[in-house]
Protein backbone atom coordinates (compact mmCIF):
# COMPACT_ATOMS: atom_id res chain seq x y z
CA UNK A 1 0.00 0.00 0.00
CA UNK A 2 2.61 2.65 0.91
CA UNK A 3 4.55 4.19 -1.97
CA UNK A 4 7.80 4.08 -0.03
CA UNK A 5 8.72 2.13 3.04
CA UNK A 6 11.51 1.75 5.52
CA UNK A 7 11.01 -2.02 5.23
CA UNK A 8 12.51 -4.12 2.47
CA UNK A 9 10.25 -5.69 -0.13
CA UNK A 10 11.67 -9.06 0.93
CA UNK A 11 10.63 -8.55 4.57
CA UNK A 12 7.14 -7.40 3.59
CA UNK A 13 6.70 -10.32 1.18
CA UNK A 14 7.90 -12.81 3.80
CA UNK A 15 5.35 -11.59 6.36
CA UNK A 16 2.61 -11.51 3.74
CA UNK A 17 3.41 -15.07 2.68
CA UNK A 18 3.31 -16.32 6.26
CA UNK A 19 -0.03 -14.62 6.92
CA UNK A 20 -1.51 -16.05 3.71
CA UNK A 21 -0.25 -19.50 4.74
CA UNK A 22 -2.08 -19.23 8.08
CA UNK A 23 -5.33 -18.23 6.38
CA UNK A 24 -4.97 -21.06 3.86
CA UNK A 25 -4.12 -23.56 6.61
CA UNK A 26 -7.46 -22.74 8.25
CA UNK A 27 -9.30 -22.73 4.90
CA UNK A 28 -10.55 -19.23 5.72
CA UNK A 29 -13.03 -17.94 3.14
CA UNK A 30 -12.59 -14.36 1.97
CA UNK A 31 -15.16 -12.88 4.36
CA UNK A 32 -13.57 -14.57 7.40
CA UNK A 33 -10.06 -13.58 6.28
CA UNK A 34 -11.15 -9.94 5.90
CA UNK A 35 -12.86 -10.03 9.31
CA UNK A 36 -9.73 -11.40 10.98
CA UNK A 37 -7.43 -8.96 9.20
CA UNK A 38 -9.75 -6.05 10.06
CA UNK A 39 -9.77 -7.08 13.71
CA UNK A 40 -5.99 -7.32 13.60
CA UNK A 41 -5.69 -3.79 12.18
CA UNK A 42 -8.10 -2.48 14.82
CA UNK A 43 -6.12 -4.17 17.57
CA UNK A 44 -2.82 -2.78 16.28
CA UNK A 45 -4.21 0.74 16.09
CA UNK A 46 -5.84 0.56 19.52
CA UNK A 47 -2.78 -0.90 21.25
CA UNK A 48 0.08 0.79 19.39
CA UNK A 49 -1.13 4.27 18.44
CA UNK A 50 -1.74 7.16 20.82
CA UNK A 51 -5.48 7.82 21.30
CA UNK A 52 -5.21 11.28 19.74
CA UNK A 53 -3.74 9.79 16.55
CA UNK A 54 -5.98 6.73 16.09
CA UNK A 55 -8.63 8.36 13.89
CA UNK A 56 -5.96 9.90 11.66
CA UNK A 57 -4.15 6.56 11.35
CA UNK A 58 -7.38 4.68 10.59
CA UNK A 59 -8.35 7.24 7.94
CA UNK A 60 -4.88 7.11 6.39
CA UNK A 61 -4.96 3.30 6.33
CA UNK A 62 -8.42 3.28 4.73
CA UNK A 63 -7.35 5.79 2.08
CA UNK A 64 -4.22 3.77 1.27
CA UNK A 65 -6.32 0.61 0.99
CA UNK A 66 -8.79 2.29 -1.36
CA UNK A 67 -5.95 3.70 -3.47
CA UNK A 68 -4.31 0.28 -3.78
CA UNK A 69 -7.62 -1.26 -4.89
CA UNK A 70 -8.16 1.46 -7.50
CA UNK A 71 -4.60 0.91 -8.75
CA UNK A 72 -5.22 -2.85 -9.02
CA UNK A 73 -8.52 -2.25 -10.83
CA UNK A 74 -6.77 -0.09 -13.43
CA UNK A 75 -4.14 -2.79 -13.97
CA UNK A 76 -6.80 -5.35 -14.89
UniProtKB/Swiss-Prot annotation:
Coiled coil ranges: none
Disulfide feature: none
InterPro entries found in the cross-reference section: UPF0352, YejL_sf
Classification via Pfam families: DUF1414 (PF07208)
Top-rank taxon: Bacteria
NCBIfam families membership: PRK13689.1
Stated family: Belongs to the UPF0352 family.
Protein name as catalogued: UPF0352 protein PC1_1633
Organism (species): Pectobacterium carotovorum subsp. carotovorum (strain PC1)
